[in-house]
Amino acid sequence: MILLALPNKGRISKPVNEILEKSGLKISVHGRSLFAQTVDPEIKVMFARAKDIPEFVRDGVADVGVTGYDLMLERDTEEELEMLLDFKFGNARLVIAAPENSSVNSIDDVKDGMKIATEFPGLTKRYLEKKGLNLEIIELSGATEIAPFIGVSDLICDLTSTGTTLQLNRLKEVENVVSSTTRLVANKKSMENPEKCVKINQVLSGIKSVLYAQSKRLIMMNAPKDKVSEITSIIPGMGGPTVSEILSNDKMLAINAVIDENKVFETVTNLERLGARDILVVPIERIL
């Protein structure tokens, strides 16, 4: 049996749960319970704060978990966890920022003794030390952007996705500390346990199959027999397109193929030019 730790709230919670459900690992949640069953009796779920999950997995409380790369770095657990997968969403950057009217325009302008407010004191401190800087770290639990304007700090170190929030709060980016995405991580001892490793890899395989399918589309069409060679040359598919007879029309063939989502528009245009018709483009839930 393995225990999977998932964020109990926040921006990555919903998409992660949706991916798990699409992978076939349906989670049965009862009320506000911190634990849940899945369709597999050997895989149980624990809901926790995303910031606590790196330590829970490292310490073996959970065998596998989903969290942000920034949170792994904050808890200094990166080297102690088995990195299994980058979901490539939940993108954010941890940046140092200063008020727009500040004389600090780059990391070179930051001086020892300045105050910096952050929700990431550990990561911020280690980064500044690498830069040879000794600042006073002010730990906050939210609303970091206001700190320079109420005399709490000179700078902030906070997450941003687009930079819009910084601009709205009259802040300018001074230094990029780290870029972060959502990660699937495992306990190293759990990965060495044959039975647990099998279950963890089943979870990993299911997630990969959903993420891979998100970038693909199944395209189906009826096409003239004399154009099949030209058509199959522009839709090679994953292992070659599937071509089959149409019983009611001996001049046409049915062709199915999987193509990249970003090539759908161009491909459909070319298929129509070659005489393909009844073209269907369908999302795919999983590719194994």
UniProtKB/Swiss-Prot annotation:
PROSITE patterns: ATP_P_PHORIBOSYLTR (PS01316). SUPFAM superfamilies: GlnB-like, Periplasmic binding protein-like II. Catalyzes the condensation of ATP and 5-phosphoribose 1-diphosphate to form N'-(5'-phosphoribosyl)-ATP (PR-ATP). Has a crucial role in the pathway because the rate of histidine biosynthesis seems to be controlled primarily by regulation of HisG enzymatic activity. One of its GO terms (cellular component) is cytoplasm. It catalyses: 1-(5-phospho-beta-D-ribosyl)-ATP + diphosphate = 5-phospho-alpha-D-ribose 1-diphosphate + ATP. Pfam families: HisG, HisG_C. GO terms for molecular function: ATP binding; ATP phosphoribosyltransferase activity; magnesium ion binding. Its EC number is 2.4.2.17. It is found in: Cytoplasm. GO terms for biological process: L-histidine biosynthetic process. Keywords: Amino-acid biosynthesis, ATP-binding, Cytoplasm, Glycosyltransferase, Histidine biosynthesis, Magnesium, Metal-binding, Nucleotide-binding, Transferase. This is ATP phosphoribosyltransferase. Its cofactor is Mg(2+). Feedback inhibited by histidine. PANTHER family: ATP PHOSPHORIBOSYLTRANSFERASE, ATP PHOSPHORIBOSYLTRANSFERASE ATP-PRTASE.
